[in-house]
Every structure is written in structure tokens, then in C-alpha cells.
Amino acid sequence: MIIGIDLDGVTYDSQDIIRTAAEIYDVEHKGKGVVNPKSLYVAEKYDWTKEECMTFLKDIVWMYTFNAPLKPYAKYVIDYLHDQGHKIIFITARGAYSSPHEDVLTKKALEKDHMHYDKILFAQTDKVQAIKDEKVDIMIDDSLDHVKAIAKAGCKVIYFREQGSPEFKHKNVNTVTNWGEIYRIFKTN
């Protein structure tokens, strides 16, 4: 089986770093404060322009790319899946919005964390196309927008739902909140 896995918010717990850094960035740059408190995206939450968001991401890319901790048991479950003969492809939007060196930093972080994978695809803002091109059987992602698009395209997806993220029901979607639940899905099916 070919398994696609997102990095930020799924493999790495980078979301807390991004949320905290965004709050500090907005204060330091005399932003408007929180404008849309329910938004999960920093640009919408603080009503930043595309340029402001790009500047923010470029400023913090090294921090979340290399310093974000792995989600609990992510390595254990990914190693298990890899050892079972599954092909692991990391499919990430990293590199689409920030530093041109984010791919190098990401590969170093994966190496530092001794992560097993077969391939990594960067700057994938259209994950549906990447999934189809790579013939991915199931994708693990935390972005509701990606989950909806993947499910509607007929692909199976595991929605790694963060606290506060909206629910989404679809015949192609399994919803989880941690890597133990992902392990159960693969171990019992």
C-alpha cells in the first residue's frame, strides 16, 4: 500500500510553534490582533495580506521546520507501516509559501529524527493531483480543505483532526486525533 502523510500538524507538532509565533509577530508588527478567532489559518485569523503572511513564514521557517517535535508516536507508527512493506510518501505544502531552502531543512529534520520514508514531495498545494500521480492508496492530513478535496476526488483519507477543527463526515474519511488511532486503523484492517 502507498501511504501519503502530511508533515505539519500530522507528523510534526509544528502548529503550536506557528500559532505562538503568529501571535508574537502580529504584536511586534502592530497588527490588528485576532480578527477571526475561529479561523485555523493565521492569515485569516489576523487578517494579514498575502505579503504579510509570506514575510511571517519566511521569518519563522527555520523554527518550525527544524525544531518542531514529532507528534507522539508518529515515528513508532510510521516505522511500523514502513516495516510492514508500505511505501511512505510525505506530501507537504512546505516550500510553497516560504524559504527556498525549506526542503533542505526538512530533509535534515527527518534525518535527525531517523524517519523512514520512501519519497517526499514539497510545495504540494494541490494534494489531490500529487496523490493521483503517485497512486497513493490513503492520505493522512490535518487540513480540512485538503481532506475534503481528497475525499471528494474518491481517495481514502485519514483526517488528523486537531482540537477545535470542524468535523467532517464522508464515506472516504476516517477521523482520528492521535497516532494511536492511526495504528489501530492499519493494525485491525
Regions found by a protein language model. Name each.
Residues K87-I89, Y117, C155-V157:
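Hydrophobic anchor at the start of a short beta-strand
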Residues G95-I138, L144-K148:
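Substrate-recognition "cap/lid" segment bordering the active-site pocket of phosphatases
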Residues Y64-P69, A74-T106:
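Substrate-recognition element of Asp-dependent hydrolases with the DxDx(T/V) motif
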